[in-house]
Amino acid sequence: MSPTATVQLTDDTAKRFEGHAKLLAIGTATPTNWVDQATYPDFYFRITNSEHLLEHKEKFRRICNKSKIRKRHLVLTKELLKKNPNLCTYNDASLNTRQDILVSEVPKLGKEAAMKAIKEWGRPISEITHLVFCTTSGVDMPGADFQLTKLLGLNSSVKRLMMYQQGCNAGAAMLRLVKDLAENNKGARVLVVCSEITINIFRGPSLEQDDNLLAQCLFGDGSAAMIVGKDPRPGLETPLFELVSSAQTIVPNTDSHLKLHLREMGLTFHCSRAVPSVLAENVEDCLVKAFEPYGISDWNSIFWVFHPGGNAIVDRVEERLGLGPERLRASRDVLSEYGNLTSACVLFILDEMRKKSKKDEQ
């Protein structure tokens, strides 16, 4: 199950937690190409030469309509798919084609978000001491972290860490990891980049594998970056959030509910119908462990940066915890405008939260 990270907005009038890591800047980026979810079933079945599967197409249309996703940004275009027809069939050996695209494009999309975060941070790029790069899109050596180091012109001595194949739990896991790095390395300024492109999951429909239709409906492409450090310098750095504590929990006997496997046909996707219920039934135990040390037990009194794995998950958790509609609004908005961005999703929601907070202050 996904990890949780407790995050607190920095407020000069509130009690300070000395020595905790601070989120100093956020940047996000998406491909310029985007698809309208309402018309995507027509495009998908046409580009995969599957228009004769009328019942399957109508089923996919119902899935898209229920997703509460309005649009998604995708690197995949009609031209790219026509050039690489092996991406459009369900079981074609296409891993080489997918890898060639991802190895090139994932670092580039990550660079766009990183440059925005660095610009907001306002400090010289030479002050970045650590780089953590995360993606579920493609595997290569030297990795995307190395490629991004070159693209940005980072110091050759920057301390790098590459995280592959962490899926949807990676966003909160990155917050936990970067908190430890920033707090245990004096003067560290950590650049975190999550860059996701869904080419590995795209393929034509299968009459035997319904999970494939959910994958084609749900995921979008995007990258997010943040700068994190401890003890921000007054007048030079502006903290946005404070990372107070983090925790991670495995729910027993759930490893079969959500599985992705890298095969010759790309990354296959299996999601049990039980996932929304399992998450809803176990989320409160995680919250109690995370917030009890701070005397917090009212889940409507805190702000939420909740990874929206899908609309059903958001609905079930909201209902189970008795949350007001505004608590998960940022998560719903990001899901609607971008789809499920896997590792980048939580950072997109953090960005949405800080924009909302700034707007409310005005």
Curated annotation (Swiss-Prot):
Keywords associated with the record: Acyltransferase, Flavonoid biosynthesis, Transferase
GO molecular function, one term: naringenin-chalcone synthase activity
Signal peptide per UniProt: none
Lineage: superkingdom: Eukaryota
Pathway annotation: Secondary metabolite biosynthesis; flavonoid biosynthesis
Active site: 168
Reaction catalysis annotation: (E)-4-coumaroyl-CoA + 3 malonyl-CoA + 3 H(+) = 2',4,4',6'-tetrahydroxychalcone + 3 CO2 + 4 CoA
InterPro entries to which the protein is assigned, alphabetical: Chalcone/stilbene_synt_C, Chalcone/stilbene_synt_N, Chalcone/stilbene_synthase_AS, Polyketide_synthase_type-III, Thiolase-like
Enzyme class: transferase
SUPFAM superfamilies: Thiolase-like
GO biological process per UniProt: flavonoid biosynthetic process; polyketide biosynthetic process
EC number, as in UniProt: 2.3.1.74
The keyword Transferase is assigned to this record: yes
Function of the protein: The primary product of this enzyme is 4,2',4',6'-tetrahydroxychalcone (also termed naringenin-chalcone or chalcone) which can under specific conditions spontaneously isomerize into naringenin.
Protein family per UniProt: Belongs to the thiolase-like superfamily. Chalcone/stilbene synthases family.
Name of this chain's protein: Chalcone synthase A
Organism: Ipomoea trifida (Morning glory)
